[in-house]
Amino acid sequence: VVEPLVQGAAGMRIYTPDFLREARRLCDEFDVFMICDEVFTGYGRTGRMWASEHAAISPDILCTAKGFSGGMLPMAATLTTDRIFQGFLGEPQRAFYYGHTFCGNPLGSAVALEVLRIFEEEQILLAAEKKAKRIEQAFSSMESWPGVSLTRSLGMVGACDLGGGSGYLADAGWRVFEKAMARG
């Protein structure tokens, strides 16, 4: 299981597509299913529809959410290869009985379809390229700022490490947040 290219919960750690390609190769070599958790990285956030596309690989299982409904409604999907799907066909005891109270919500489904329509009609991914370059330039320019120790970006994701402590308890991030809120 990997978060392709951007480890969001680990502090926006960005790694190279080579790592993902090697992980795919190893999964193939040892006949292990590769699961890409694209909940954060999917829907163009890295500049491509799926972050795994940067490495030109396809996972066996892809998990998506958040951007699936434009972040407006709880909506998620788990996509699989035909090989995995075929494993659940046939006799009833082979079926994958999966369901819960909120499966197939009609409002969430309608919003997800509308998001896909907007992505295609407004060519969101093409616009993302220009925005990604602007974000990269903005974050790169911060490297010379006092208190900024590391910057990185990929697509719509930009992050920087601030000096003066480390981890979630450091107050530098809170000071930036407070200044940003004061500026609207």
What are these regions (language model features)?
Residues 1-184:
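Conserved N-terminal phosphate-binding loop of PLP-dependent enzymes in the Aspartate aminotransferase
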